[in-house]
Amino acid sequence: MNFHPCYPVDHGVPSWILVLLLSLGLCNLQARADRVLDPDFHENYFEQYMDHFNFESFGNKTFGQRFLVSDKFWKMGEGPIFFYTGNEGDIWSFANNSGFMVELAAQQEALLVFAEHRYYGKSLPFGVQSTQRGYTQLLTVEQALADFAVLLQALRQDLGVHDAPTIAFGGSYGGMLSAYMRMKYPHLVAGALAASAPVVAVAGLGDSYQFFRDVTADFYGQSPKCAQAVRDAFQQIKDLFLQGAYDTISQNFGTCQSLSSPKDLTQLFGFARNAFTVLAMMDYPYPTDFLGPLPANPVKVGCQRLLNEGQRIMGLRALAGLVYNSSGTEPCYDIYRLYQSCADPTGCGTGSDARAWDYQACTEINLTFDSNNVTDMFPEIPFSEELRQQYCLDTWGVWPRQDWLQTSFWGGDLKAASNIIFSNGDLDPWAGGGIQSNLSTSVIAVTIQGGAHHLDLRASNSEDPPSVVEVRKLESTLIREWVAAARLKQPAMPRWPGPKKQHPSR
């Protein structure tokens, strides 16, 4: 297994630098992350096996798995490796929004590695066809974890640090993967920080109404009047639709197409509901650009927009604009282009990455969440296991394995695991689907008061709530202890004592 040939973006890079990087098996694409503490990431490709578990179908065929690496803070031979298990998107997006890892690497003299998940970003086993039906058979959690394990071993060997203690990091689905890495490959990973990892929910456990109930709670907590206004807006849309006033809905909400069928109404409801999901997840106390440009405290801003409009449907339109029209240049909402219904009711996004995630939600990742207009403020949009099965058969020709993650990765019964931190923010609607209490002395749960989706992974900010500052201190301490313990467990090099002394016979 060798690193993929590199193609430098900046052809003016001195040749001696490229030679040095190539000698390490690392080829520089001169890409950088924009952070307060700049890690100076270099983009690389690794020749990764297409199929780790079948010796016949693809043999030794490989694809280019992208990863980012920074040795800016690394004390070679002594510092640990901090390894981000990439999730459902371009790896640069996660690297640019995980500043805590950079800060921690500077403190603990660690090598930083961000590994892209197969089928996402530029890590495409079948090129541009990868996310088309008929080419997705190698997209599984298990294959992705094996990618990470093989890449990590190759890096260690190439850099001559076979025993460097490694800590896995990840957020959301990536947080699930970091925990799974510790569980499946404990000989490679000494511990894991699993931020906002919904390991219980995605295993098909828990309450199907939990997610949208918790999104509602975020807005109700900001303003009970806001939550009621949301209910009123959706009800007005429904009433107008039943009256056949399709043009009125389109004019007030600003859709590009006039609604004409129940399918259009459901699409509009899903489109609007998704805006609330994004605002709740991204409810950070400062402006961000993770899932798109958002202001500080976007839930508060969204409620202000909604309540400032005298007409409720127009208020709903103004709130949705935070997500779908941040530039203010969209003349209307193309609800079928901007939002695509999929096997994840919380939203898949659009484009190739969205198709890959849709497939995963049709196979191993169980996301059967409903809104019911009783425990939440949204229209009734059911998504049962039966509906999931039919959608997945029609779309991908696959039958979901409803309980597979309970079998393969233990569901919520993780007492036998060790050295995992499950962190959640109390503002994050995913928190209710994760581990929320300590399972043992080394599998611990921490809650960030005033924290949204994996806030602790983000770089330190003067607007951070005090709780996340304390949580990061705890995480830093535990990670340092895990690294130290892993070093103590490393076997000493055996020494040959020499020939036994022969005693003369008596």
Swiss-Prot record:
Task: Locate the transmembrane regions by residue number.
Answer: none
Note the PANTHER family from the entry: DIPEPTIDYL PEPTIDASE 2, PROTEASE S28 PRO-X CARBOXYPEPTIDASE-RELATED
The record's Pfam families line, in alphabetical order, gives:
Peptidase_S28
Q: Which gene encodes it?
A: Dpp7
User: Which Gene Ontology molecular-function terms are recorded?
Assistant: aminopeptidase activity; dipeptidyl-peptidase activity; serine-type exopeptidase activity
Show which residues constitute the signal peptide. 1-33
Q: Which UniProt keywords apply?
A: Aminopeptidase, Cytoplasmic vesicle, Glycoprotein, Hydrolase, Lysosome, Protease, Secreted, Serine protease, Signal, Zymogen
What Gene Ontology cellular component terms go with this record? cytoplasmic vesicle; extracellular region; Golgi apparatus; lysosome
The main enzyme category here is: hydrolase
Provide the propeptide boundaries.
Answer: 34-36
Q: Which SUPFAM superfamilies match?
A: alpha/beta-Hydrolases
* EC number(s) given by UniProt: 3.4.14.2
Compartments, as annotated in UniProt: Lysosome; Cytoplasmic vesicle; Secreted
This protein's species is: Mus musculus
Entry-listed glycosylation sites: 60, 96, 325, 366, 373, 438
GO BP: any one term: proteolysis
Q: Major location, coarse class?
A: other
What's the name of the protein? Dipeptidyl peptidase 2
User: What job does this protein perform?
Assistant: Plays an important role in the degradation of some oligopeptides.
Record's subunit section: Homodimer.
Active site residues per record: 172 (charge relay system), 428 (charge relay system), 453 (charge relay system)
Q: Which family does it belong to?
A: Belongs to the peptidase S28 family.
Which reaction equation describes what this protein catalyses? Release of an N-terminal dipeptide, Xaa-Yaa-|-, preferentially when Yaa is Ala or Pro. Substrates are oligopeptides, preferentially tripeptides
